[in-house]
Amino acid sequence: MAKTFSSICFTTLLLVVLFISTEIPKSEAHCDHFLGEAPVYPCKEKACKSVCKEHYHHACKGECEYHGREVHCHCYGDYH
């Protein structure tokens, strides 16, 4: 009984790891198109992400990045 339970746990764990490893790169790979800048001053990561979602509905991430000497909130998304 313990051997069967151990085998089921290992198989389940393997399937979960396989599912996670294939889905994460797909979602991040589609989020590389620059959509524009969002007005967040000073730029904070959480605020940048939420403002990007407000301004660009198909934004999947917002990052604070240097643009010249200033930090700006850049919004990224994908087009289907």
From Swiss-Prot:
GO terms for biological process? Answer: defense response to fungus; killing of cells of another organism
What are the GO cellular component annotations? extracellular region; secretory vesicle
What name appears for this protein in its UniProt entry?
Answer: Defensin-like protein 204
Principal location class: secreted
Q: Which UniProt keywords apply?
A: Antimicrobial, Disulfide bond, Fungicide, Plant defense, Secreted, Signal
Renumbered to this chain, the signal peptide range is 1-29
Q: What is the protein's species of origin?
A: Arabidopsis thaliana (Mouse-ear cress)
Where in the cell does this protein reside?
Secreted
Superkingdom, natural source = Eukaryota
Name the protein family. Belongs to the DEFL family.
Disulfide bond entries? C43-C64, C48-C73, C52-C75
